[in-house]
């Protein structure tokens, strides 16, 4: 015959099961525990303590591993598409400098293949693209620099004379919206570069194309973006330093 002990008052009951109520303190059957031989209450079977620190740490670690695995899987699955999108965006920026804007993805791929005939890297990050635009040769040069809040870059398209600007396109990663962002978002401002000259006359000792708050050489300089002096200064320096890397080619 089994023995059951009331955890409230200590009353011991003998029988097949615990009484519905303790006759001494009226505690319910749930307050009784088995007594094993020797008089001690049967130890409770230990389960998983979901309130313990160990459980919390282990659970969190498992979730971190699962989430990391899922993110890695998704990233790996999308990598090819992401790389393709980056390359396509780069091609569109090149076409923008030729004033071929607003093209769909398919149109951009087709037009790029038609127009760009050769690509040459003179230094890491600095490339020359030789293009055939409606039977006319154009050269596109990549440049890069720093704006107020982050990196800026550009594509400078020249006519076959390697002196006259055909078109430009600038990009940025984080310039002030409405001010510094004008270098990318304002086609009207970019159009100011059309027809400008890299050099002052026949003197090819230095690039004079630039962006100035007060224009002194109208044949080669463009008005700075109002309210974005530091960004404009960054573009000016980028043009002079960046295009100087192509001096050997430009002087040919």
What are the functions of these language-model segments?
Residues 2, 14:
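Catalytic cores of transferase enzymes with a strong primary signal for eukaryotic protein kinases
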Residues 3, 19:
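Residues immediately within or flanking Cys/His clusters that coordinate Zn2+
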Residues 7, 23:
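Cys/His/Pro-rich metal-binding microdomains
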Residues 10, 26:
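Cys/His-coordinated zinc-binding microdomains
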Residues 15-16, 29-34:
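Short, non-ligating residues that shape and space the ligands of small metal-coordination modules
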Residues 18, 28, 175:
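A generic "binding-loop/recognition-motif" signal
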Residues 34-45:
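Intrinsically disordered, low-complexity Ser/Thr-rich linker and spacer segments
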Residues 43-252:
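Flexible, solvent-exposed loop/hinge segments and secondary-structure transition points
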